[in-house]
Design a protein with these regions (language model features):
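Gly/Ser-rich helix-loop-strand patches that form or flank binding pockets
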Residues: 1-32, 133-178
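General small-molecule cofactor/ligand-binding pocket signal
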Residues: 25, 65-67, 118-122, 174
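Small/aliphatic-rich secondary-structure junction motif
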Residues: 37-89, 116, 178
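A short acidic, glycine-rich active-site loop
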Residues: 86-99
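A short helix-to-beta-strand connector/capping loop
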Residues: 112-118
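Charged docking surfaces used in two-component/phosphorelay signaling
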Residues: 121-129
């Protein structure tokens, strides 16, 4: 029954997200009181900014963790057996530094006081790294921005949102339209 439940949950939730401008909360755990540990996955877009702003309003006295995950598997595949390992490591370090600068700039330009946000950068497959971050920090809520009414963008995001709604365990998920 869990598989059917997950399919219905995902399709119903995403259908609701597509037809309302209101945030949609998917409750996945028993309530333990107000949210204290809130995680915001970040791709540095306007939708992430909207999610971060709403998260800051929801938990005005808590620090928010903003997570950016990047993946270098394609780079590894292209460079494997073509470039010295030390050069691959240097390129990866450069990419990490660039992503860190992007995260720092995003947080600096956010509408949330810098003392209220904490950035975290992880390399890997985004759904797995998001779950690992939820587990490590014992996050209670994941606040994720979604696209507006653009059909192609909605279709693309639908896959990401669907994976987050289905795969994140141990935390509620709040989907926020930008």
């Amino acid at each position: 029954h869990q598989g059917v439940h997950d399919v219905l949950l995902g399709s119903t939730t995403l259908n609701l997200v597509h037809h309302t401008d209101l945030p949609v909360l998917v409750v996945k755990r028993p309530a333990e009181g107000p949210y204290e540990r809130v995680l915001v996955p970040a791709d540095f877009s306007e939708r992430t900014r909207s999610a971060l702003n709403l998260a800051a309003e929801l938990v005005p006295d808590q620090v928010l963790r903003v997570l950016h995950v990047y993946n270098l598997d394609a780079l590894d595949n292209v460079l494997r057996n073509r470039v010295e390992r030390s050069e691959v490591d240097r390129i990866k370090a450069d990419v990490r530094a660039e992503r860190q600068q992007e995260l720092d700039a995003f947080l600096l330009n956010a509408d949330v006081h810098p003392d209220r946000v904490e950035g975290q950068l992880r390399m890997g497959y985004a759904p797995d790294e998001l779950q690992a971050a939820v587990d490590e920090w014992d996050a209670q809520l994941v606040v994720m921005g979604t696209h507006g009414r653009n059909r192609l963008a909605d279709a693309l995001l639908g896959g990401v949102a669907r994976r987050v709604v289905h795969q994140v365990k141990g935390a509620d998920v709040l989907l926020v339209r930008s």
